[in-house]
Amino acid sequence: MTAHRRHPAAIAILLLLGLVVVGGAYSLLAPKTAEASAVSADSVADGRALFLANCATCHGLAGQGTKAGPSLVGVGAASVDFQVGTGRMPLAGPSVQAAPQDPIKFTPEQIASMAAYVASLAPGPAIPDSQYTTGKDGNVALGGELFRVNCAMCHNFAGAGGALTRGKYAPSLQGVAGKDVYEAMITGPQSMPVFNDANISPEGKNSIIAWLKTTQAEQNVGGMTLGNLGPVSEGLFVWVFGLGLMIGCAVWLGQKSA
């Protein structure tokens, strides 16, 4: 038998041929991925143009922050979607706290583009999946427990909001969209702490949203709610009106018997 020697370049040719076949097959079977990348690049470019025109004055040309506004590097798309999507940004004027404004100054497409640009600066919280922002399939009992432990101290036990220090306040959560509640938890706007997935899981956040929607849909069986502000407002009401009424009655009875 005669031994056949392989050409030294045979292995290299086989590897090159294999790469060509695999690369060609991938390009044929995954055209949508390439299209998605192109759209994403266009979205980032559009977002940068919007950012430079509307945000760079306060946040810097590269989002690095200035004396007039904080850095946006690492805040993620969720922060932009929350702040701009609720009308808190652009800031209407100098104030202690940004308040939601209506109407919103940008379209959903423009907000998505700006969010994509800010997300490209550095990793940060992404816009949440819709399956965790509707409250559907959430555990209402668990949501109520999580809310009382983590949120009620500022937002009140009924989500009616409350006063904070230095002129700030915790806004009411009544009628707030589930996505806004979720994004606030993962971005921590203003004085609010951040509740990432290690603190409260996505399922837990969805349960909180379910609890908020359930309490808001409950029918009031009667009585004065006093703004649902809890024992402080109730105590003030008793002291001012209740005690005042008692003093008035005492004075009236004293004059009558005199």
PLM feature segments, named:
Residues 98-99, 155, 254:
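Generic secondary-structure boundary signal with a strong preference for alpha-helix termini
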Residues 1-8:
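Cytosolic-side transmembrane helix boundary signature
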Residues 8-31, 103-129, 196-257:
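C-terminal capping alpha-helices of c-type cytochrome domains
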Residues 30-43:
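Ser/Thr/Pro/Gly-rich low-complexity linker/stalk segments immediately outside membranes or between
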Residues 73-122, 164-220:
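Extracytoplasmic electron-transfer domains, predominantly the class I c-type cytochrome c fold
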Residues 40-44, 48-74, 82, 86-92, ...:
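Periplasmic/extracellular electron-transfer cofactor-ligation site
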